[in-house]
C-alpha cells in the first residue's frame, strides 16, 4: 500500500526585498500563508529511487527537488535511497506559490515514514535550506509565518493565542507564464526605509489597508515586463476583491474577499480568460 503526503501551496501576504547580501542572495521579509491547493506525492518501497510525474513537462531526474530531497535525507539518516515516488501535480510551478519547495518538503516527511527514520526537526530544516528558501516553511506545522533572511528564518504567526489563519476568501489566478525567481530578483530594487510592519498589518485583518499597504516589491517589474500577469491583476481588480496582490515573484496573482459569494462570482467572471484559478473559501 503506497504512502501518500499532500504538498500544499502558499501565498505571500506582502513581500519586501530589503538588501542584496554578500553571498548573492537577498534579505527579504514576508508573511507566508499555507493554502489548500496541493500536489500529492506517493511512495512505495523499492531498491532504488525513481520518480514519475503526472505533468510530463517536469523533469524526473536529479533536477527535480523531490529527488534532491530524497537523496539528502538518505544521506543524513545513513539509509539506502530506495522508493518509487509519484508526483501528482496540481499546483502550477513558476508561479510564486512555492509548489516545488512544498513537494520537496512533503517528500522529506513521506520518506521519513517510509524508511522508518526519525530525523530531528533541525535536521529536516537544514536539509530543506539546502534545497530552497521556502522549504523550511513547508516543514513547519503553523499555517502562517513571518519570514526573514532568505525567507527561511521563520516566526510562526499567532493571533489571540491561536495560530493565525486568513479569515477571508481567497481567489488565485495564474496566467500561462512561468517566472524564474533569479530573473525577478535581477529586476527588483531593494529598499529598507519606510516599510510598514508586516506582522502588525497582517494581524490587523484590515483589508481596507491591505490593498494599499501590503505591497509586493516584485509587482512593478513583473507586471511591467509580462503583460499576462498585468492582465490577470487587472481582471481581479475588476471584481469585488478588497485586496489584490502578486504572490512571491509571480506569475500568480490573488484577490481577497470579505464575502465568499463575491469570490465565487469573481471566479465565474474569470472563466473565459486563459487563467488557472483556485478558490479557497473563508473558514467557517
UniProtKB/Swiss-Prot annotation:
It is an enzyme of class 2 (transferase). GO terms for biological process: isopentenyl diphosphate biosynthetic process, methylerythritol 4-phosphate pathway; terpenoid biosynthetic process. One of its GO terms (molecular function) is ATP binding. Pfam families: GHMP_kinases_C, GHMP_kinases_N. SUPFAM superfamilies: GHMP Kinase, C-terminal domain, Ribosomal protein S5 domain 2-like. It catalyses: 4-CDP-2-C-methyl-D-erythritol + ATP = 4-CDP-2-C-methyl-D-erythritol 2-phosphate + ADP + H(+). The keyword Kinase applies. ATP binds at residues 92-102. Pathway: Isoprenoid biosynthesis; isopentenyl diphosphate biosynthesis via DXP pathway; isopentenyl diphosphate from 1-deoxy-D-xylulose 5-phosphate: step 3/6. Keywords: ATP-binding, Isoprene biosynthesis, Kinase, Nucleotide-binding, Transferase. The keyword Ion transport does not apply. The active site is at residues 10, 134. Gene3D superfamilies: 3.30.230.10, GHMP kinase, C-terminal domain (3.30.70.890). InterPro entries: GHMP_kinase_C_dom (IPR013750), GHMP_kinase_C_sf (IPR036554), GHMP_kinase_N_dom (IPR006204), IspE (IPR004424), Ribosomal_Su5_D2-typ_SF (IPR020568), Ribsml_uS5_D2-typ_fold_subgr (IPR014721). It comes from the Bacteria. Its EC number is 2.7.1.148. NCBIfam families: ispE (TIGR00154). Belongs to the GHMP kinase family. IspE subfamily. Catalyzes the phosphorylation of the position 2 hydroxy group of 4-diphosphocytidyl-2C-methyl-D-erythritol. This is 4-diphosphocytidyl-2-C-methyl-D-erythritol kinase. It comes from Salinibacter ruber (strain DSM 13855 / M31).
